[in-house]
């Protein structure tokens, strides 16, 4: 199965799919930190998500007719509820709001471009935010405390994730 893991420079998910025998590739705007440049595409996901000629980080070129599965982790900086307060004049100057609003719109476009890719199986992960009202409700809500070590494990205890698929 041809698997594209979008917005993933760490290659953690990509490596697991490879371990299971799939032809998986990670894709991000930056070089990978996972140590497998032959499995990494440094490009905008929108340029390769519908298949075609791809160039891997190690400069190898190959053709992918179509992806069988796309899993995406688009940046949440402007999409999450944590970003919402930055769009309020009570806490942020107008010139910064304008810039953040443009960044939010671009982030929403990226999310929607991935959601509308020519692929039968698409999964998008993001925290609670604007997309569950601007797009639709998620198919699954993942509560991080299911995986937390303890209540003191703040990062893994409180940041609810949404899965669209």
PLM ranges: what are they?
Residues 2-53, 71, 78:
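SAM cofactor-binding core of SAM-dependent methyltransferases
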Residues 6, 37, 42-44, 48-67, ...:
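Class I S-adenosyl-L-methionine
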């Amino acid at each position: 199965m041809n698997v594209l893991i979008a917005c993933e420079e760490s290659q953690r998910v990509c490596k697991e799919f490879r371990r299971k025998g799939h032809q998986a590739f990670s894709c991000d705007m930056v070089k990978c930190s996972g140590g497998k440049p032959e499995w990494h595409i440094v490009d905008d996901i929108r340029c390769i998500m519908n298949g075609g000629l791809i160039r891997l980080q190690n400069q190898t070129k190959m053709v992918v007719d179509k992806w069988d599965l796309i899993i995406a982790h688009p940046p949440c900086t402007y999409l999450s509820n944590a970003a919402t307060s930055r769009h309020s004049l009570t806490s942020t100057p107008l010139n910064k709001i304008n810039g953040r609003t443009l960044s939010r719109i671009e982030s929403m476009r990226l999310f929607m471009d991935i959601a509308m890719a020519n692929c039968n199986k698409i999964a998008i992960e993001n925290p609670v935010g604007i997309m569950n009202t601007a797009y639709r409700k998620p198919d699954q809500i993942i509560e991080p405390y299911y995986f937390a070590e303890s209540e003191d494990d703040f990062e893994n205890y409180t940041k609810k994730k949404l899965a669209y698929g």
